[in-house]
């Protein structure tokens, strides 16, 4: 559990002490801590989601970069089939992006750039990414529809 505490307390929430943009060294440190805490991946993902939800607007995009870095490193290290982070992030991805889009308007293009890279590299399926791109264009987020 100490690797999880290191990730959440020391790495993730210490981002608030730095002025964006976040250095490559800091991002690498956060990513390594997340991968080290893979046994607690659900908590790692929840920590990132909570950070994005609660941080100041100027830290929204760095929060996305943390998410991106963790997913890419996990896929690189363990392979696409064994990556646990991307499937977990996708569970609440609409809500996470609703918070991300509360960033300064200049930062929205950075979010779209990450989404386009995810689409190009098949990090998430198109049916996950397309609604997020639509949200960037000002369309309302999709709602869950239940058939009775």
Identify the role of each PLM range:
Residues 1-148:
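Eukaryote-specific intrinsically disordered, low-complexity regulatory regions enriched
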């Amino acid at each position: 559990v100490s690797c999880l505490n290191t990730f959440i307390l020391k790495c993730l929430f210490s981002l608030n002490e730095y002025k964006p943009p976040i250095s490559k060294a800091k991002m690498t440190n956060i990513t390594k801590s997340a991968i080290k805490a893979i046994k607690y991946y659900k908590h790692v993902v929840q920590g990132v989601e909570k950070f994005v939800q609660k941080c100041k607007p100027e830290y929204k995009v760095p929060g996305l970069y943390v998410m991106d870095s963790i997913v890419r490193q996990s896929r690189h290290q363990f392979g696409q089939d064994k990556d646990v982070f991307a499937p977990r992030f996708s569970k609440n991805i609409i809500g996470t992006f609703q918070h991300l889009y509360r960033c300064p308007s200049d930062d929205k293009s950075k979010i779209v750039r990450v989404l386009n890279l995810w689409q190009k590299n098949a990090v998430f399926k198109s049916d996950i990414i397309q609604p997020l791109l639509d949200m960037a264009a000002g369309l309302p987020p999709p709602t869950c529809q239940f058939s009775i």
